[in-house]
Amino acid sequence: MERQNLIEMEGVITESLPNAMFRVHLDNGFNVLAHISGKIRRNYIRILPGDRVKIELTPYDLTKGRITYRLRKR
């Protein structure tokens, strides 16, 4: 599967929803509905509201995304 045309952005988790879905407020001001990628799910990485994350968006639907990385707290 090609991942060349994905848009990668950063944001903050604002709300935790059922079925491992999250509402994310991106740095550019938009809100996105995102799910957890398989590697994060397999490694039991916990994502909570307030965490900064990296998100992949497809150019076809900019309202949904995939959480690929949880950034460390400073």
From Swiss-Prot:
The keyword Glycoprotein does not apply. Its main location: plastid. One of its GO terms (molecular function) is rRNA binding. CDD domains: S1_IF1. Pfam families: eIF-1a. It is found in: Plastid, Chloroplast. Residues 1-72 form the S1-like domain. Keywords: Chloroplast, Initiation factor, Plastid, Protein biosynthesis, RNA-binding, rRNA-binding. InterPro entries: NA-bd_OB-fold (IPR012340), RNA-binding_domain_S1_IF1 (IPR006196), S1_domain (IPR003029), TIF_IF1 (IPR004368). Gene3D superfamilies: Nucleic acid-binding proteins. Belongs to the IF-1 family. Component of the 30S ribosomal translation pre-initiation complex which assembles on the 30S ribosome in the order IF-2 and IF-3, IF-1 and N-formylmethionyl-tRNA(fMet); mRNA recruitment can occur at any time during PIC assembly. One of the essential components for the initiation of protein synthesis. Stabilizes the binding of IF-2 and IF-3 on the 30S subunit to which N-formylmethionyl-tRNA(fMet) subsequently binds. Helps modulate mRNA selection, yielding the 30S pre-initiation complex (PIC). Upon addition of the 50S ribosomal subunit IF-1, IF-2 and IF-3 are released leaving the mature 70S translation initiation complex. This is Translation initiation factor IF-1, chloroplastic.
